């Protein structure tokens, strides 16, 4: 009798997506042909030795040592002039590498003719040398879904079949030579749950930009193709500057001034490994004094590709504590490792929920409200997150919603109220970022709007497009179209339009959108718990 009563009281299970969007990335194919990689310096030397033998002679070796070292050229400028012939519909003076990218981009000739400048903008982005093999600080890969969000799924050496030609492949010979230089004990990276082409892209050091604010690029807009048959549309300047990078010792000295003194093993107990990456490990642990469960990232500093970002991320997290942000708790230097202690949210990332379950408008409104509260706090403290997406939203089992991953965040100052670096994740990028214009905090609002579409449709717009064409569509299409707009309420559609307004001045701010009528539909955060449980169960079943 009691069993039948219990069954009657249980709420119906939340709806699951018929086709999980959390699919293996190998299912996607953008027909992106990889570009050949420029030969590395050591390979050039090997070829020279084969042409000029005698390197094995001791006398020659001695002479080689005596030769003065000639440094690489600096402050040189390589200018590319690309034009567009409106009659033939072809670009003129386009580099071969760009031509190859364009051929595999699926951007039609009509689209190229319609907006050649947008095509060149996205080509410039892909050609940016600093996008190759860059990796965010504190990013790991793991097959453990509970670690998702703490173990970011955008590690640059995690390759999948559908990866776009951001990082050209290396030959087997070059690959072997690189592997010899790396630690043989490094575990192989696990394939990330999201397609590799949704990974975050980093093209300029945030620390460098903060330390010495530079004025936005005021390069004049080239004449349009309509005004001349063959106009110079684009100038690409490639400079190699002497950068004032911090030395490893300077970084360690700065970290020592930030971290706590003492042995973390005396403060935390019951360490349980939840993730492993090439540069470190993530554990859960208990604070002995409070009993609080925490996440601890243990990173080998020697294996961190951008050590300068460590200081940036820790300082931003430490100085910006908020109920809607995954809060930094503490950090320690233990030998060659940096241990960063953060809040632990056992619910996993929002990505698991959006890809495995169907959210209703009340639940979506609740998530949007919590995210806007986090963004309002950050923006009021002159911080732009720059990588808002479901992967960077963590959930507690009680339904709490918190923003994480400050590897790309930027501090803005009165002297530098706009930024012009290309960072973020392509499918969530605001148009002004794609077209490399100066931008402000409202780039986070656009990304939030794209994330709201994720919650409706299970994935961001253009995810199945070639990444280069997706960037073109973001730059030219304006507000992306919904698959089934008629299924959404008028108030929700208006909220999306306010977030995804092309005109930045008309786009809502976090403070303004917190007053939007759509947020009045928000259900209690506890309504997210059944979705979290259903997503965990679906993922567990799919892995069997």
From Swiss-Prot:
Give residues where Phosphoserine occurs.
2, 4, 50, 139, 171
Protein purpose: Serine/threonine protein kinase that plays a role in a variety of different signaling pathways including cytoskeleton regulation, cell migration, or cell cycle regulation. Plays a role in dendrite spine morphogenesis as well as synapse formation and plasticity. Acts as a downstream effector of the small GTPases CDC42 and RAC1. Activation by the binding of active CDC42 and RAC1 results in a conformational change and a subsequent autophosphorylation on several serine and/or threonine residues.
**Database matches in PROSITE patterns:** CRIB, PROTEIN_KINASE_ATP, PROTEIN_KINASE_DOM, PROTEIN_KINASE_ST
Residues annotated for ATP binding in this entry: 274-282, 297
- Region span, GTPase-binding: 65-108
EC number of this enzyme: 2.7.11.1
Stretch list, region Autoregulatory region: 65-135
* GO cellular component terms listed in the entry, alphabetical order: cytoplasm; endosome; glutamatergic synapse; postsynaptic density
Quaternary data: Interacts tightly with GTP-bound but not GDP-bound CDC42/p21 and RAC1. Shows highly specific binding to the SH3 domains of phospholipase C-gamma and of adapter protein NCK. Interacts with the C-terminal of APP. Interacts with ARHGEF6 and ARHGEF7. Interacts with GIT1 and GIT2.
The catalytic activity, as recorded, is: L-seryl-[protein] + ATP = O-phospho-L-seryl-[protein] + ADP + H(+); L-threonyl-[protein] + ATP = O-phospho-L-threonyl-[protein] + ADP + H(+)
GO molecular function (one): protein serine/threonine kinase activity
Q: Which UniProt keywords apply?
A: Allosteric enzyme, ATP-binding, Cytoplasm, Developmental protein, Kinase, Magnesium, Metal-binding, Nucleotide-binding, Phosphoprotein, Serine/threonine-protein kinase, SH3-binding, Transferase, Ubl conjugation
Name the residue ranges with Basic and acidic residues bias: 63-73
The entry assigns this protein to a family as follows:
Belongs to the protein kinase superfamily. STE Ser/Thr protein kinase family. STE20 subfamily.
* Domain CRIB positions: 70-83
Question: For this protein, what post-translational modification is recorded in UniProt?
Answer: Autophosphorylated when activated by CDC42/p21.
What is this protein called in UniProt? Serine/threonine-protein kinase PAK 3
């Amino acid at each position: 009798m009691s069993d039948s009563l219990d069954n009657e009281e249980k709420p119906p299970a939340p709806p699951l997506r018929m086709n999980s969007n959390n699919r293996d990335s190998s299912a996607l194919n953008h027909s992106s042909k990889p570009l050949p990689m420029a030969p590395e310096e050591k390979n050039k030397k090997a070829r020279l030795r084969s042409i000029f033998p005698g390197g094995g002679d001791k006398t020659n070796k001695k002479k080689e040592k005596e030769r003065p070292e000639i440094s690489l050229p600096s402050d040189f400028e390589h200018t590319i002039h690309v034009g567009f012939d409106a009659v033939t519909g072809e670009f003129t003076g386009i580099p071969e590498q760009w031509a190859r990218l364009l051929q595999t981009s699926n951007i039609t000739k009509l689209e190229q003719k319609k907006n050649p400048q947008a095509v060149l903008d996205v080509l410039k982005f892909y050609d940016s040398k600093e996008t190759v093999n860059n990796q965010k600080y504190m990013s790991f890969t793991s097959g453990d879904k509970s670690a998702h969000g703490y173990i970011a799924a955008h590690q640059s050496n995690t390759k999948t079949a559908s990866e776009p030609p951001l990082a050209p492949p290396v030959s087997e010979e070059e690959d072997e030579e690189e592997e010899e230089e790396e630690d043989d004990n490094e575990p192989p990276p696990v394939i990330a749950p999201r397609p590799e082409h949704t990974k975050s892209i980093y093209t300029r050091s945030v620390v460098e930009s903060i330390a010495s604010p530079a004025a936005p690029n005021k390069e004049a807009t080239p004449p349009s193709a309509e005004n001349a048959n063959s106009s110079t549309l684009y100038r690409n300047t490639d400079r190699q500057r002497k950068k004032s990078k911090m030395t490893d010792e300077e970084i360690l000295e700065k970290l020592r001034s930030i971290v706590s003194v003492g042995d973390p093993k005396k403060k935390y107990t019951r360490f349980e490994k939840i993730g492993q990456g090439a540069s470190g490990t993530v554990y859960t642990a208990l604070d002995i004094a409070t009993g609080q469960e925490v996440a601890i990232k243990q990173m080998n500093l020697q294996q961190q590709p951008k050590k300068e970002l460590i200081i940036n991320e820790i300082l931003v997290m430490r100085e910006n504590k908020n109920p809607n942000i995954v809060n930094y708790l503490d950090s320690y230097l233990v030998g060659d490792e940096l241990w960063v202690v953060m809040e632990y949210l056992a619910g996993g990332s929002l990505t698991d929920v959006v890809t495995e379950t169907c959210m209703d408008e009340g639940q979506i409104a609740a998530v949007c409200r919590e995210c806007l509260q986090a963004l309002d706090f950050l923006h009021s403290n002159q911080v732009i997150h720059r990588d808002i997406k479901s992967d960077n939203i963590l959930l507690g089992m009680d339904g709490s919603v918190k923003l994480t991953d400050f590897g790309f965040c930027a501090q803005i100052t009165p002297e530098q109220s706009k930024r012009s670096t290309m960072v973020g994740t392509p499918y969530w990028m605001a148009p002004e970022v794609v077209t490399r214009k100066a931008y402000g905090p409202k780039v986070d609002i656009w990304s939030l709007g794209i994330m709201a579409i994720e919650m409706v449709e299970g994935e961001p717009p253009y995810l199945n497009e070639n990444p280069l064409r997706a960037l073109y569509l973001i730059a030219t299409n304006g507000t992306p179209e919904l698959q089934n707009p008629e299924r959404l309420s008028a108030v929700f559609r208006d909220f999306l339009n306010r977030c995804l307004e092309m005109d930045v001045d008309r786009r809502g701010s976090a403070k303004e959108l917190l007053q939007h009528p759509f947020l009045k539909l928000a259900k209690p955060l506890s309504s997210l718990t059944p979705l979290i449980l259903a997503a965990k169960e679906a993922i567990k079943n799919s892995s069997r």
